[in-house]
């Protein structure tokens, strides 16, 4: 079983046996991975860069292992022999508790959670039979204190009492588990979470800190999975934005406020927009702790918000940090019409970044930097500064 695997970045047992292919480039040296990603980025953005322009900054990377702060474990097997991990390409249940992307303390806790499921007698959900209860275990780690947010995704309320009975022993053994919740996902589909969240602890949010900015994680709020590189991403955004000395700032798709809060000062009027209400509540708590009074966070669709404004409302600078689909043609048009002095675009999908750049009129790229938040994969984050012509 995976519990006795000794993994190194050169020799991942899961990858070598074909059990997990998530880190498809794990046997490629990090320098080569970065070179390939950099070349891909430069090729994608080539149509938007003048031939003599030196706008690409050196890529930023972090550790090759033990960097990930979130585990999404499918619960497989049976109540007496649960497995936390994935279904391999060959169809077998594979425990990923020893995945080398996780810090060692997180690996140990994942093993303990496997025991917890067994001791509590919670039957894993069987997709093939549409029976069972426990679908996923989601574990998020805060690097600032080593604390955890633990979520059990269940088909129904039937096993909540079993979790509650076994929980005191677990929390006594692991007091660093700060938040525990149950999410109810009754649909027989590959959906990670449902609408209903039930907290089993008094605490409902996990505290994190990047640079000097306090940030908070709630069960449904998006948060970067590579804290070391994410901190550098936010710090770079802060430095780039400060060069414009803006008096007003919009942070669209703001999540828990990471970008806007890093760039804000007591003199900047910041408006943060995010569709997820939980994330907005976290962002507001952070702003209050930082003593920022000229800040407004609202749970709205970013495109709808922008389309409801007119040119007189425009800020000096707009930050966008969209999901993989990008910001879309409608928001591109709104940004072009507002014509702020600059637009800072943080993208987790350079293909949609390039597509959006085709529709943002009247701007040119001045800085582009790659942040390797997802080593061993094809994915990476890009920070791009667009300045008005």
UniProtKB/Swiss-Prot annotation:
Stored InterPro entries: 23SrRNA_MeTrfase_RlmC (IPR011825), MeTrfase_TrmA_AS (IPR030390), MeTrfase_TrmA_CS (IPR030391), SAM-dependent_MTases_sf (IPR029063), U5_MeTrfase_fam (IPR010280)
Q: Which Pfam families match?
A: tRNA_U5-meth_tr (PF05958)
Q: What is its EC number?
A: 2.1.1.189
Q: Does the keyword Iron-sulfur apply?
A: yes
Q: Does the keyword Membrane apply?
A: no
GO BP annotations, alphabetical order: rRNA base methylation
Q: Where is the active site?
A: 348 (nucleophile)
Molecular function GO labels? 4 iron, 4 sulfur cluster binding; iron ion binding; rRNA (uridine-C5-)-methyltransferase activity
Keywords from UniProt, A to Z, are:
4Fe-4S, Iron, Iron-sulfur, Metal-binding, Methyltransferase, rRNA processing, S-adenosyl-L-methionine, Transferase
Q: Which SUPFAM superfamilies does the record associate with it? A: S-adenosyl-L-methionine-dependent methyltransferases
The residues the record assigns to binding S-adenosyl-L-methionine are 224, 253, 274, 321
Q: Which positions does UniProt annotate for [4Fe-4S] cluster binding?
A: 12, 20, 23, 99
Catalytic activity, as annotated:
uridine(747) in 23S rRNA + S-adenosyl-L-methionine = 5-methyluridine(747) in 23S rRNA + S-adenosyl-L-homocysteine + H(+)
Name the job this protein performs: Catalyzes the formation of 5-methyl-uridine at position 747 (m5U747) in 23S rRNA.
**NCBIfam families (alphabetical):** meth_trns_rumB, rumA
State the family named in the UniProt similarity comment for this chain.
Belongs to the class I-like SAM-binding methyltransferase superfamily. RNA M5U methyltransferase family. RlmC subfamily.
Q: State the protein's name.
A: 23S rRNA (uracil(747)-C(5))-methyltransferase RlmC
Give the gene symbol: rlmC
């Amino acid at each position: 079983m995976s519990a006795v695997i000794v993994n190194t970045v050169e020799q991942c047992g899961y990858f070598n046996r074909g059990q997990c292919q998530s880190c498809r480039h794990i046997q490629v040296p990090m320098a080569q991975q970065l070179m390939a990603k950099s070349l891909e980025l430069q090729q994608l953005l080539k149509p938007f860069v003048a031939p003599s322009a030196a706008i690409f900054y050196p890529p930023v990377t972090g550790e090759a292992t033990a960097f990930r702060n979130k585990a999404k474990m499918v619960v497989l097997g049976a109540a007496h022999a649960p497995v936390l991990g994935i279904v391999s390409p060959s169809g077998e249940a594979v425990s990923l508790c020893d995945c080398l992307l996780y810090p060692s303390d997180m690996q140990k806790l994942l093993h303990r959670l496997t025991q917890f499921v067994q001791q509590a007698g919670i039957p894993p959900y069987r997709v093939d039979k549409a029976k069972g209860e426990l679908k996923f275990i989601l574990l998020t780690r805060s690097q600032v204190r080593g604390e955890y947010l633990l979520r059990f995704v269940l088909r129904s309320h039937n096993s909540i009492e079993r979790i509650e009975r076994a929980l005191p022993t677990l929390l006594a053994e692991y007091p660093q588990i700060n938040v525990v919740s149950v999410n109810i996902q009754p649909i027989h589909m590959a959906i990670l979470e449902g609408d209903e969240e039930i907290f089993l602890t008094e605490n409902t949010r996990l505290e994190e800190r990047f640079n000097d900015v306090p940030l908070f994680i709630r069960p449904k709020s998006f948060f970067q999975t590579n804290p070391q590189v994410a901190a550098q991403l936010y710090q770079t955004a802060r430095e780039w934005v400060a060069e414009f000395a803006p008096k007003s700032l919009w942070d669209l798709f703001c999540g828990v406020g990471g970008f806007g809060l890093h760039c804000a000062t007591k003199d900047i009027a910041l408006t943060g927009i995010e569709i997820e209400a939980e994330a907005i509540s976290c962002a507001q708590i952070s702003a209050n702790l930082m003593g920022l009074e000229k800040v407004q966070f609202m749970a709205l669709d970013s495109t709808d918000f922008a389309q409801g404004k007119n040119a007189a409302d425009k800020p000096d600078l707009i930050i966008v940090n969209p999901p993989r689909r990008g910001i879309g043609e409608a928001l591109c048009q709104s940004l072009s019409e507002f014509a702020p002095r600059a637009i800072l675009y943080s993208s987790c999908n350079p293909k949609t970044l390039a597509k959006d750049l085709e529709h943002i009129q009247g701007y040119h790229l001045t800085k582009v930097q790659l942040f390797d938040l997802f080593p061993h994969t094809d994915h990476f984050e890009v920070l791009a500064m667009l300045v008005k012509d």
